[in-house]
Amino acid sequence: MKECIAKLLREDKLCSVFTNDAEKFMAGYLLDSDGEYMLMELFNPYGYSDGLCCQRIESVTKVETDTLYNEDLELLAGYRGQTRRQKIERQGNVLDAFLTEALRGKKLCTVELYDSGCDDVIGFLTEIDGEELVFAMLNEHGNPDGETVFERGSISSIKFESEDEEKISALFRLKSAKE
C-alpha cells in the first residue's frame, strides 16, 4: 500500500481511502506521506472541505481512483469554489507535523486509537511530552469532559477541521463565552 500511496501523491488525484472500518471511507487529496502516516485533505459528499486527516498507512485496506463518486466529488468541490490546501510544513515525520499544527493552532481533534473504528478521543491537544500526548477532552455537546493521556504510537488516525470538530468547537466557544 505504501507504493500506491506514493504514486497517488505524485499524481495528485482525488481518491477514496478505505480502512479497517468497512463502514466508512474518506475522500480527498493526499498531501503528504512518510511511509508510516499519510496526510489527506478531506471533502464531504457535497463537495465541501472537511478538514485534514493523518492516517496510519498500515490501516489502509483499499484505495479507489477514477470512480464516478470521485469524479462527482471533484466537480462539486469545483462548483463550491473549494480551494486546495497546502500541506503542513514538516521537519520530521507526518504525524509529528500534524500534532505540532494541532497544538500550535489549538485545533479540536478527533483521534482513533488502535484501529478501534471509533472516535476514541475528541479534544484539544494540550501537551506533547516525548511519546505521551495529553488531550483536554470535550463531549459531543462541546462540554469539557476531563483529560486523557496516551502514546502517539497508538494513533490510527487523527483529524481536525472537519464539520464535526467545527461544530463541537463552536459549541465549546459559545458556552465558554457565557461563563
Task: Please describe what each predicted stretch is.
Residues 1-25, 39, 43-118, 139-179:
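Short glycine-rich, low-complexity segments
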Residues 37-40, 132-136:
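Short aromatic-glycine-enriched beta-strand elements
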Residues 31-36, 57-58, 128-131:
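Short, solvent-exposed coil/turn segments at beta-strand boundaries
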Residues 26-32, 120-127:
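Short beta-strand-centered aromatic/proline hotspots
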